[in-house]
Amino acid sequence: MKTYIAAFFLLLSATFVAAHPYLIQRLGIEQGLSNNYVLSITQDKQGFLWFATEEGLNKFDGTRFITYYKEEQSSSVQSITGNELNEVYADPVQPVIWIATQRAGLNAYNYETQSFSVYQYNPEDPQSLITNDVTHITSSVQAGKGLWVCTYYRGIEYLDIATGKFTHYNKSTVPALPSEQTWTATEAEDGKLYIGHVEGGLSILSLNDKSVKHFVHDPQNPNSLPGNDVRCIYKDTNGNIWIGTSKGLALFNANTDTFTNFHNNPGNNHGALSSYISVSY
């Protein structure tokens, strides 16, 4: 099974840190967290924090943890479908926490009604989730209506939330895709879907005509993608696209199809703390 490493990198100057001290509180098993291996954190509309771990879903109210585990099939209690989780994502519109599991599909927890919805592969339904191994979840540009779901080896899925049906984006439907192994994806307002592959570089899929641009690291080109293992893609408030890889951070220029790269430099106190970037917010 693949190994996940979730890390948060805070890029702060020494002057800023000196002027603004931070109090860091450790939250672990001793404080009620179900497992110290945390892969993802999100915050819901009510301000609560949710943690995806290797052993269940955790909600933190600022004082204590509430843990959600998979119930036995014989139980009538609704629950998550697997305890080994990859990601949690707070829906920006609905009171829902979306939960990506490692081998048990996609779950949705409505924290107002305290109910679960489950999306799993069904061989008899061609519009069901194509695989139960989900790596990443994010909203489409039409927040609250659609969801992009990345899978480890079967490409990208688009979920129509109203119908519960999935549209598949893989080599069968988009032959130009270089790989179906995906870590992450982000949709831009111009109809482009940015896809981060597992050791396969970056793809930009036009949702209008299904054409694909593909980028990989070129050791002879300092303005190429810094690494081929693309772990996270972030669109900032100015529309800039940031790419996190195992070999550094890059800012993508859509006009020139080039990258400005930011690597770890031990001699630069104002640079990135590490070249391994796996999560950005």
Task: List each language-model region with its residue ranges.
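Carboxylate-rich, polar loop motifs that coordinate divalent cations or form catalytic acidic clusters
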Residues: M1-Y281
